[in-house]
Swiss-Prot record:
The gene is hsdS. InterPro entries: Restrct_endonuc_typeI_TRD, Restrct_endonuc_typeI_TRD_sf, Type-I_RE_S_subunit. Keywords: DNA-binding, Plasmid, Restriction system. It comes from Escherichia coli. One of its GO terms (molecular function) is DNA binding. The lineage of its organism: Bacteria, Pseudomonadati, Pseudomonadota, Gammaproteobacteria, Enterobacterales. The specificity (S) subunit of a type I restriction enzyme; this subunit dictates DNA sequence specificity. The presence or absence of a 4-residue repeat changes the sequence specificity; a third copy of TAEL inserted at position 179-180 changes the recognition site from 5'-GAAN(6)RTCG-3' (for EcoR124I) to 5'-GAAN(7)RTCG-3' (for EcoR124II). PANTHER family: TYPE I RESTRICTION ENZYME ECOKI SPECIFICITY SUBUNIT, TYPE-1 RESTRICTION ENZYME ECOKI SPECIFICITY PROTEIN. Type I restriction and modification enzymes are complex, multifunctional systems which require ATP, S-adenosyl methionine and Mg(2+) as cofactors and, in addition to their endonucleolytic and methylase activities, are potent DNA-dependent ATPases. The presence or absence of a 4-amino acid repeat changes the sequence specificity; a third copy of TAEL inserted at position 179-180 changes the recognition site from 5'-GAAN(6)RTCG-3' (EcoR124I) to 5'-GAAN(7)RTCG-3' (EcoR124II). The shorter protein is also known as Type I specificity subunit S.EcoR124I. Residues 350-404 are annotated as: Conserved region 2. The type I restriction/modification system is composed of three polypeptides R, M and S; the restriction enzyme has stoichiometry R(2)M(2)S(1) while the methyltransferase is M(2)S(1). There is an equilibrium between R(2)M(2)S(1) and R(1)M(2)S(1); the latter is methylation and translocation proficient but restriction deficient. This is Type I restriction enzyme EcoR124I/EcoR124II specificity subunit. Contains two DNA recognition domains (TRD), each specifying recognition of one of the two defined components of the target sequence.
Length: 404
């Protein structure tokens, strides 16, 4: 009997009661679990968590106020964005805008069943909305509880749903772990290929390798700069990818002609020069299309005898070195000193050697970063499969009184 057939047999003829989330769960504020230190390090042992995409911000050596999730797992819920994570290891919390959610009665409701159901809900996050979401909204949402009058059978159904979804998430986790291993391998070979001894090849400053462009923000008050825009306007939020051919925001030709931002030819390498992300990493990407930048970005078009892909790989390899050399000290937001950036030196071998290096690294790059090939594509397909079955498993008949 297939897993789905077994579940269908379990569900055959059962009643379902839709109960407010606040009735079957309880929450704790993270106040006594908040981290105090800011100097995170990979050699420390206690993770510092956020409910958002980053999840693990770093590791602390603090030993007091540790949430013991290894003994009793918990859902961490961001009270503003509604992002949530399942946690089954000990941790410290970063933000007070977080709820630690647990089940009121494990003999009636499995917390992981609640977690999987939570993730079937569409996001209701609105930019600029500072309303606390758990009490005002999510605690009132109704969750389907099968066989409410038969706790034993209810738990059996919940457990089976959790077991099936755990298998899907485990498959994705295995692929993600393999991808991370390959990325480390790629970074190692990239750094080896791009290492040259003094005197082996010519060294140039970043300012000498090509033409640099800055960015700007067209006036938000001029609708003609933004409405029906077709020109990518790239900002740090678009730099989660290493190859960029689209952006979240677009501007018009009118904006290019009459604002501080200028059109940059295709095949430039862009970097972030002002953002809190610079406290951790220097985001860089190959911009494959003509585009514009906001004021927190810079881009370079290499000179004719320098391959754009070589510079793309080189900046990716030297990112941490560039940050150490060029990041400004002080200031409320991390930023790059342009003078120090442009004076940073990199090795530039002859064009044939550049081509050889690029061909080798491009093959690795496809395996680790391509969303149409390799592991990233497989992970994306597994995630879609998981979401399909998750939504199917929670598709209980919904009464008219439930408006989730």
């Amino acid at each position: 009997m297939s897993e789905m057939s077994y579940l269908e047999k379990l569900l055959d003829g059962v009643e379902v009661e839709w109960l407010p989330l606040g009735e079957i769960t309880k929450y704790e504020q993270p106040t006594k679990y908040l981290v105090k230190a800011k100097d995170y390090h990979d050699t420390y042992t206690i993770p510092v968590l956020t409910a958002g995409k980053t999840f693990i911000l770093g590791y602390t050596n603090e030993t007091h106020g540790i949430y013991q999730a290894s003994k009793a797992p918990v859902i961490i819920f961001d009270d503003f964005t509604t992002a949530n994570k399942w946690v089954d290891f000990d941790f410290k919390a970063k933000s007070s805008a977080m709820k630690m959610v647990t089940s009121c009665d494990d003999n009636k409701t499995l917390l992981k069943y609640v977690y999987y159901w939570l993730n079937t809900l569409p996001s209701e996050f609105a930019e600029g909305d500072h309303k606390r979401q758990w009490i005002s909204n999510y605690s009132q949402k109704k969750i389907p509880i099968p066989c409410p009058d038969n706790p034993e059978k209810s738990l059996a159904i919940q457990s089976e749903i959790v077991r099936i979804l755990d298998k899907f998430t485990a498959l994705t986790a295995e692929l993600t772990a393999e991808l991370n291993m390959r990325k480390k391998q790629y970074n190692y070979y990239r750094d080896q290929l791009l290492s040259f001894k003094e005197g082996e090849v010519e060294w140039k400053t970043l300012g000498e390798i090509g033409k640099w462009y800055g960015g700007g923000t067209p006036s938000k008050n001029k609708i003609e700069f933004w409405e029906n825009g077709s020109i990518p306007w790239i900002s740090p939020k678009d730099m989660g990818r290493t190859l960029v051919d689209s952006s979240e925001d677009y501007i018009t030709e009118e904006a290019v002609l009459h604002s501080s931002t200028k059109l940059i030819p295709a095949n430039s390498i862009a970097i972030v020069v002002r953002s809190s992300i610079l406290d951790k990493v220097l985001p860089s990407a190959l911009i494959k299309v003509p585009a514009t930048l906001n004021q927190d970005m810079k881009a370079v078009i290499p000179h004719e005898n320098i391959l754009v892909k070589y510079i793309y790989h080189m900046i990716g390899s030297r990112g941490s070195d560039i940050l150490r050399a060029a990041k400004k000290t002080g200031g409320s937001v991390a930023s790059i000193d342009s003078k120090k950036l442009f004076s940073f030196k990199i090795p530039v071998p002859n064009i044939n050697e550049q081509q050889r290096i690029v061909e080798i690294l491009d093959k690795f790059d496809t395996l680790t970063n391509s969303i149409t090939e390799g592991l990233p594509r497989e992970i994306e397909l597994r995630q879609k499969q998981y979401e399909y079955y998750r939504d199917l498993l929670f598709s209980f008949p919904k009464p008219e009184t439930v408006s989730n």
